[in-house]
Amino acid sequence: AGVNHNGSLEMAKEMARVAKECGADIVKYQTAVPELVVSKFAEKAEYQKQTTDAAESQLEMIRKLHFSFEAHKELKEYCDSIGIQYLSAPFDVPSVKFLGTLGLPLLKIPSGEITNLPYLEAMAAQKTPVLLSTGMSTLDEITDALGVLDDGGCPEVTILHCNTQYPTPYEDANLTAMI
């Protein structure tokens, strides 16, 4: 679900409900403190300008899309109540630590954080299995991230072969990289 709920807690809950009805086991969101991950000077991409208020900054847009920690707690409780696992990808260390308080059985590392060593150390410190997204990463960066996670005591890592272009052109899929 990411931030496709447009900042609406009710829509996020509805997405979880529909996912459960369709047979999904897990629904994934994103957790971030916007001021820690987006510069107040960052401009929006052209596609963002076309689909949101062109006059607002990237930071203002992101603030509207992300939930508070309290809202994430409520969303997790809702997911528990309907029998679907809540998962989130934290984008900063405070979000990692917050999600650690929820007792989640799994966390997800977004592609953009694979070279963020303090972040990876915080993830490993949760002692929780992780999904590691690898979009835009070199094999050396993936190897280094795995080393940080292993050294920090992360019990299990599942590597996700990712491409950050949606939809991915067939010629860029490079599925042989998985073997």
Model region roles, listed by residue range:
Residues 1-179:
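Catalytic cores and adjacent flexible loops of soluble metabolic enzymes
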